[in-house]
């Protein structure tokens, strides 16, 4: 279950606000740089989340979570290498080199107790989330600057 509050104290704006937007740790650096009026460096990932909070709009439909375990857990033969996609409605998780995964309908199962990954009724949802996860992985990959000249 991933539901972690993030508290931001802003000396430029002391009025309390809250948001249910999907935020990530990759959003912290762009937010700090924006607040300090510093141009972000080439290839920075994430977005300035204060704009979303001030406008009361969500800036992303889903969010990828990466996890690389450093120990072998029960049921695994090596440390887990995991990618999850969280949306308002679903959480979808894949484990590297494993046949199983996780799919939870957060609207009907907010405590994530009924894994729907192998449920045939959710196969189209699983396919859609798989594609979105791949797109998130491509979006968050490090990018090199484009060359200014070609030889």
Feature names for model-found ranges:
Residues 1:
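Membrane-interface catalytic loops of GT-C/OST-like multi-pass glycosylation enzymes that act
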Residues 4:
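Active-site neighborhoods of enzymes that stabilize oxyanions during catalysis
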Residues 9, 14, 26-29, 34-102, ...:
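C-terminal cap/loop subdomain of S1 sulfatases and analogous C-terminal strand-loop tails that border
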Residues 15-22:
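A short glycine-threonine-serine/GTX helix/turn-capping micro-motif
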Residues 73, 116-151:
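Long, internal low-complexity/basic segments
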Residues 109:
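Intrinsically disordered, low-complexity polar regions and short flexible loop motifs
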């Amino acid at each position: 279950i991933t539901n972690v509050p993030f508290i931001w104290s802003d000396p430029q704006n002391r009025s309390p606000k809250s948001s249910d937007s999907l935020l990530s740790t990759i959003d912290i650096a762009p937010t700090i740089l924006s607040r300090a009026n510093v141009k972000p460096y080439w290839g920075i990932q994430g977005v300035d989340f204060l704009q979303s909070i001030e406008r009361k709009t969500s800036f992303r439909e889903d969010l990828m979570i990466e996890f690389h375990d450093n120990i072998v857990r029960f049921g695994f033969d090596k440390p887990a290498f995991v990618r999850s996609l969280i949306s308002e409605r679903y959480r979808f998780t894949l484990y590297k080199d494993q046949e199983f995964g996780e799919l939870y309908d957060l609207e009907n199962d907010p405590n994530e107790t009924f894994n729907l990954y192998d449920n045939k009724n959710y196969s189209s949802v699983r396919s859609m989330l798989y594609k979105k996860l791949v797109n998130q992985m491509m979006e968050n990959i490090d990018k090199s600057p484009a060359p200014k000249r070609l030889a």
